[in-house]
Regions:
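Conserved phosphate-binding/catalytic region of the ribokinase-like
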Residues: 45-153
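Conserved beta-alpha-beta core of the PfkB/ribokinase-like small-molecule kinase fold
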Residues: 1-55, 62-63, 73
Length: 153
């Protein structure tokens, strides 16, 4: 299984066209894509998440896509299914660094445990809720990657 998270940081690129080209290559190689709402807009010009993801799936033939939308939650697209999960909004958020990476780690944990082909809507909803909760928890403390926590947390 090849996963890809574009993790677009415009300030790190001399030319955004080059970023788009490199991200497109990553998408063309992956089985699992974790992508944020702003990255969907960057790559497709679409502000509608569903339409943007459908464009990416059609163009790159990606079997499993998870879109993160900040306080709007997340969505998974697989086969002909779309599953949504609400965000966990934390009153004591102090640093969002690592939230996307934490979400992606939880996503991959579920896929490795249950397989990419054997996903059903309920399991995917559970996966999104788990990933959203973990991503929310990571924002409540200033921490390093080594302090990310465990499945139990």
């Amino acid at each position: 299984i090849i996963s890809f998270d574009p993790n677009l940081r415009p300030a790190l690129w001399n030319h955004l066209d080059e970023a788009k080209e490199k991200i497109a290559f990553g998408m063309s190689q992956c089985d699992v894509l974790k992508i944020s709402d702003n990255e969907i807009t960057f790559m497709t010009g679409e502000t509608d998440i569903d339409r943007g993801v459908q464009k990416l799936i059609e163009k790159y033939q990606i079997p499993f896509v998870c879109a993160t939308m900040g306080n709007q939650g997340s969505k998974a697209f697989f086969g002909s299914e779309i599953v949504e999960a609400e965000a966990f909004l934390m009153e004591d958020t102090i640093d969002t660094t690592g939230a996307g990476d934490t979400f992606c780690a939880c996503l991959l944990d579920y896929i490795l445990r249950y397989g990419i082909q054997k996903q059903d809507k309920e399991r995917v909803r559970e996966m999104l809720q788990f990933a959203n909760a973990a991503a929310a928890l990571i924002t409540t403390k200033k921490r390093s990657a080594s302090d990310a926590g465990t499945r139990r947390n």
